[in-house]
Swiss-Prot record:
NCBIfam families: gatA (TIGR00132). Belongs to the amidase family. GatA subfamily. The lineage of its organism: Archaea, Methanobacteriati, Methanobacteriota, Methanomada group, Methanococci. It holds the Pfam family Amidase. This is Glutamyl-tRNA(Gln) amidotransferase subunit A. GO terms for molecular function: ATP binding; glutaminyl-tRNA synthase (glutamine-hydrolyzing) activity. Heterotrimer of A, B and C subunits. GO terms for biological process: translation. The gene is gatA.
Length: 431
């Protein structure tokens, strides 16, 4: 019975000390489960009875959509985002809203006004961010699957740290209507799951064109493909910036592809040093623009007075480099760099079907450890190129170091999501 499964998850959530959830309404989801059991039209849908957690920057009617910030602490969603409507239409149930870095501006899960999320795979370490609660909820078995958002690695980073699967679809594959945006030219919604097969199913359920999001695209259903004849690219610079212990685990993962019959191709990406400055300069400007609606008049509090330290830092830098006298010096140069980075990245796919490598260059730090902003940003160096270039990228578990999970990142060209998801599935089967 679906209601029994919902009750079991609600009990687990209640007992959990991971701090994965911000808002759970047991009475509401149990009532919806009872109605679902009587709904014969949804019984053959791919997500029928699946219990899904949703990141707290995606609108779900009747739930607190706070972005883990005191700015929106009292805001309750008045509508369902397009992805949530799609989930419900496929027979899924929303169990609650997950914790996250405030306004999705972080890589650790520690900037939430509700306190940090713990990593179920290594309880003394960060789970990664910004989709920290969604990743932790899946890793701790507090739901069947979860939805997160990825602006510069916010699905893939916590998936890697928590030892689960995460997928960032190509830009435009999934509608962002109902998402509280961080940086609109980078943002994408995607799945966090216990296995790669579920990531394929969940991506198919939420993707598709939406009149409410002009960037959204229609794509055919993603199917599993044979990858045995694929060329797998390994980028030297991605490996070089990664800690040796993580690199060793990734090299074992690359051998798995070789054993499957894939050809390994050595590649070089000369713009790796531009990744973080390009990403963050554009991010700051777009985030500053996005937060102007949080003025304390229509809803919530005035953001500059209510937000935390990291969000305020991003707003102030974004304001500064948006000014006319600095825009040409910083923002416009970042846009030029983005164009060069994208051209170079897309060129790599002329030599390889997919690019495989590490997700994050270092192990997650311990909860509460003093880490500088620059050290925090360094977690993103291998994930932001995906968002800068609009390509797709997934993460699957690839070993561990003293019990701390390591994630293998698989990147594909724009709209080659099917290839990436297929490779994730085959890797899991053969690892």
């Amino acid at each position: 019975m679906i209601t029994d499964r919902v009750s079991d998850y609600l009990e687990k959530i209640e007992k959990s000390d991971v701090n994965a959830f911000i808002d759970v309404n047991g009475e509401k989801v149990l009532k919806e489960a009872e109605e679902l059991e009587k709904n014969d039209t949804l019984k053959n849908k791919p997500l029928y009875g699946k219990i899904v957690a949703v990141k707290s920057n995606i609108n779900v009617k009747g739930y607190k959509i706070s972005c883990a910030s005191k700015t929106l602490e009292k805001y309750v969603g008045t509508y369902d985002a397009t992805v949530v409507k799609k989930l419900r239409s496929q027979g899924a149930l929303i169990v609650g809203m997950t914790n996250m870095d405030e306004f999705a501006g972080g890589s650790s899960g520690e900037t939430s006004c509700y306190g940090p999320t713990k990593n179920p795979a290594a309880m003394d370490r960060i789970p990664g961010g910004s989709s920290s609660g969604s990743a932790a909820a899946v890793a701790a078995d507090l739901c069947d699957m979860a939805i997160g958002s990825d602006t510069g690695g916010s699905i893939r980073n916590p998936a890697s740290h928590c030892g689960i699967v995460g997928f960032k679809p190509s830009y435009g594959v999934v509608s962002r209507q109902g998402l509280c945006d961080l940086a609109m030219s980078f943002d994408q919604i995607g799945p966090l799951t216990k296995n790669a097969e579920d990531a394929l199913v969940l991506t198919n359920a939420i993707k598709g064109i939406d009149r409410s999001d002009s960037t959204s695209l229609e794509t055919p259903k993603f199917e599993k493909k044979d990858i045995s004849n694929y060329k797998i690219g390994v980028v030297k610079e991605f490996m070089d910036v990664t800690d040796e212990k993580i690199r060793n685990e990734i090299e074992k993962g690359i051998e798995v592809f070789k054993d499957m019959g894939c050809k390994i191709v050595d590649l070089s990406y000369k713009y790796i040093d531009l990744a973080l400055p390009t990403y963050y300069l554009i991010n700051y400007v777009e985030f500053f623009s996005a937060t102007r609606k949080y003025d304390g008049r229509r809803y919530g509090e005035f953001i500059e007075e209510a937000c935390g330290e990291e969000v305020l830092r991003r707003i102030l830098i974004g304001k500064h480099i948006s000014e006319q006298e600095f825009s040409g010096k910083y923002y416009k140069k970042a846009l030029q760099a983005r164009k060069s980075m994208k051209k170079e990245m897309l060129g790599l796919f002329n030599s390889a079907d997919l690019i495989v490598g590490p997700t994050v260059p270092k192990l997650p730090h311990k909860l509460g450890e003093d880490v500088s902003p620059m050290e925090m940003y360094a977690y993103d160096v291998l994930t932001v190129p995906t968002n800068i270039c609009g390509i797709c990228s997934g993460v699957v578990r690839c070993g561990n170091i003293s019990g701390v999970p390591v994630g293998l990142q698989i990147q594909g060209a724009p709209l080659e999501d099917e290839k990436v998801l297929s490779a994730m599935i085959e890797f899991e089967k053969n690892y």
